[in-house]
Amino acid sequence: MTDMPRFVGSMVALVTPFRDGEVDFDALGRNIEEQIDQGTMGLVPCGTTGESPTLSHDEHDKVVAFTVEKAAGRVPVIAGTGSNSTEEALRLTRHAQQAGADGCLVVNPYYNKPTQQGLYEHVARLGEVGLPIVLYNIPGRTGIELTPDTVVRCYEDVPAVVAIKEATGKPDVTSAIASSCDITILSGDD
């Protein structure tokens, strides 16, 4: 895991602006510049705040590629690539890697409520791409929670897993993860 980045600091979950039913790339570009000018330490397009479940595949791909291009290496870009479909999450993760993203934010597969083993297998498959993974544990949105044991297992067994965005709002869960492994813990519930 020494070759993988450690994502730290305040990062912004970007909104995906629309105008007349289309992604407003001018507004997105202005937002990216403003966030970088104000000192953000990372950009996260196509996460929950970026309305990833409501974007078409084409829109999703274009927003990620645009964000990477606009950031131009000034700050890391962690592209939201999660899906309740492992194959779709793989496609999104591969695209993010090809576009030049520095990492990917992988929300727990929503609606289907897989077992902890199923969650682990989902993450392990995505890890095969090789793009650094930030797990996203937000059970209030997904209906399923990664347990601390599963987080530790993913971190220890899947070299691409470098961080978790822990959004359960449960200090005991965060403490259990922190005391069990050296994964970077990011916090946020948006």
Task: Provide a role label for each language-model segment.
Residues 2-12, 16-143, 153, 161:
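Active-site beta->alpha loop and helix N-cap motifs at the rims of alpha/beta catalytic domains
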Residues 128-131, 140-190:
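Catalytic alpha/beta core domains of metabolic enzymes, predominantly
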